[in-house]
Structures are given as C-alpha cells and as structure tokens.
Amino acid sequence: MELGFVHILSLIATLTVVLGCGIYSSRKVKSADDFDVGGRSAGVIMVAGSIAATIIGGAATIGTAQGGFTFGFAAWWFTLGSGIGFLIMAAFYARPLRKSGLTTISEYLVINFGPQAGPIASIAASLGIFFSIVSSSLSSVHLIGGILHLGYLPSAAVVVLLVMGFVFFGGINSSGMAGLFKVGLIFATIFVGGYLAFTDMGGLSGMHEVFPELPWFSMFGIGADHALFNLFSMIVGVVSTQSYVQSLFSAKNSRVAALGCLFAACIAIPVGLPSVIIGMFIKLHHPELNSIDTLPFFLCNYLPEWLGGAGLAALVLSCVGSIAGLSLGVGTLFSRDIFGAVLKVHDSKKLLWINKLMVLTVTLAALVFIHSHLDSSVLQWNYLSMALRGAGVFLPMTAVIFFKGMVGKKAGLLSMFGGIASGCAWHFIFPTSPYTLFVSLFFNLLFLVPSIAYNLLHSKK
C-alpha cells in the first residue's frame, strides 16, 4: 500500500486520540479490581463499548472481508453469530452472572463444582481465547506491515507497543473508552466503503451478473455442516468468553449488564456485511490480490485520503483493541484463578502487576505463533477458538444457571474435563472436521444430564 500525506496525517491523528484515552484511563487504576472490572461502575455505553472493542477485531473486519473475497456471504457468520450470542447472553446470562459479584467465569464454576474447577476452566478458556488473539495478531501484523512497509519483526514490535498503550495502563477502562471511539470509526469508514462498493457493482442485480449464486450469495455456500459449526461456535464461544463476561462484571448492576450486551449485539451484527461486500468488490476488480489485504487495500485506494487514513487507523485499532481485550481476559484468569486461588497470591498490587505481565506475555506468545502461519485464514482461528472456549465451560455454566443445585460436583468436573479432552483429541485426529464443538458438547451432556435427572427426580420425592 502506498499512503499519501493526508493518509498518514489522518492515521496518526486518530491513533493519538485513542491512545490518549487509554493513558487517561490509567489514572483511575489503583488496584487489581479497578484494572479487571473498572471498580464495577461501568454504565451501559461503557459495557457495550468494552464488548465491541473486543469482538470487532481482525476477524470482524479484515477476516470477514478476506472471507467475502474467498467465498462471499457465508463470511458474515462471524459477526452474525456473535451478535446472536450477545442477544442470548443479554436474555439469560447477564443478570445471574453480574449478581454473583465475581470477576471470572472460573470463580463462578468453583462455587458450584469445587476448587478443582478453577484451573480446568481457566486453562481451557485461555487456550481458546489464545487462538482469537492469534487471529487478530495475524491481521495486525499484515496491516501494520503494509502501512509502514515493515517486515514481520518490526511489525510485531509495533503491535506490542500499541497493546501496551491500550490495556497495560488502563485495563478494562481503556478497553471500553477506546472501544467507543473505534466503533464510531468503523461505522464511519467500513459502512461508507461498503455502500460505495455496493453501488459501484450495481447493487444486488449487478452483483448477481458477475457472481454465481453458489457459493457467493448463500450463507451455506461453504457447506451446511461448516456453516452450522461456525454459527454454534460463535454462540457458545461468546457466552463462554472471559473477556465478554468480564465486561458484564464491570457493570454497575445486572440491568446495565443486560442492556450493554443488547447494545453490543446491535453493533456487532451489521458490521460484517459491508466487509463482505468490500471483499467481493475487490475479488471482482483485483482477483490477484492476497486475500488478507482486501480491506486495507480498498480503504487506501477507493476512499478519499482523509477518510481512508481514518479507516486504516480504525482497522489498526480494531485489531489491536481486540488483542488488548482478549489478553486482558487471559491475564485476569491467570492472576485470579492460578496465582490467586492456587498459588495464594492475595496482595492487590502484586495481582495487578501479574495481570499486566500476563497481558504482555500472551501477546508475545501469539506473535511468535503466527510467524509460521502468516498466510492462513483469519476466520479459521476464530472459529477454532470459539469451539475450544465453549468445550469445557458453556454447558456446565448453563446447567448451573438453569438447574441451580441440581448438578453434582463430580458430574460438573467430569463434564468440564470430558468436553475439553474430547474436543482437543478430535481436533488433533481430524483437524479439518467441522464437528469438534459438537463432540465436546456431547461429552458435556453425557455427565450433566444423568446428574440433573437424578437430582430432579429425588427433589420431587
């Protein structure tokens, strides 16, 4: 990509404003609780902004455009599925989770299944979240490398510095404030770009003239089994993700938590559609382009320079903000559930620094991992991530919420372990299979259903 002076000026100005928000937020951070959940004082907009900052990352923008370039409308499953997941979370999960007054999903499971549940849930959730960080890191390195004409190592170093500016100083407050600004930029640039691409191709009728119905216009163009896996992975993964639940814990009350989820869904669902259309536009006019460069190339070459520069900044913020929010979730899990619960570190300042160092460590680990996967699909890592997150958490947590007191501790632990072990084993044996998540859910139910049925029968006697 060749940037003009106005591109660069607009990009730098936008990044400066958002990083300034992150540094300003750090003034409010005095303890680990402030860093993790913002002192539990966030309003609806801050909760929604914090969730949006994490979900609208490399997959929702660059990855969805890459999918649109490759197979069309089926790439919309990522943001559509995540939005449906947030609606379900708002309806059934937000209130009981916020009322618990806890900080992590693992703590919620420990109360019901005993202390052994904490490390199992934390490690499983962190493994799943890690692959989402991989996805956004992949997008970030390609994007920053293209903007600054840098190789892998310098681009990775820039990513680390930006993540530190986002979260290292401000925690959940930084993620929320930056999220609000970023969402505004995404809507102002991606939607304008999508509209211009749509009209340039002659609307739907014009698109149908140059693209066949299958696979380009079908949500099941990649196969019904893969589409259903993608949808259920997103729903299960969203509900099971520490980073999103952490935003609920930061809300001032349960009503605010539910409304924040609802607003986040309204933001997430439409974002993927213009990215898909831009992907198809670039496929039509530049079929030789590397698919992962689709969206940055469009913003640089098909929008006015001032808007294109802001759009590129929005993509950088989108990718890096997602890394920041997800890394914060992993850092919180490890600091609270491993160092706090297992290693008995209870000093608030020590936990704060452990959390910050974990954010940095996880970011570096993801950047090392992508070095050997630089040409892979962004969305594939996210769908795998969501499936792994839900494997040991979704149904056990759901059972506790809907069948309170009806799940035995041993059954809960076996369900968690069985789901995680079977999911990992299945993916290792059949790496391209779309059934990983369903295998995990089957093993969850294998232990949960008998326990719930037994306790329900005995409670009626």
Model-flagged regions — what are they?
Residues M1-K461:
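Membrane-embedded helix-loop-helix hairpins and adjacent transmembrane boundary segments
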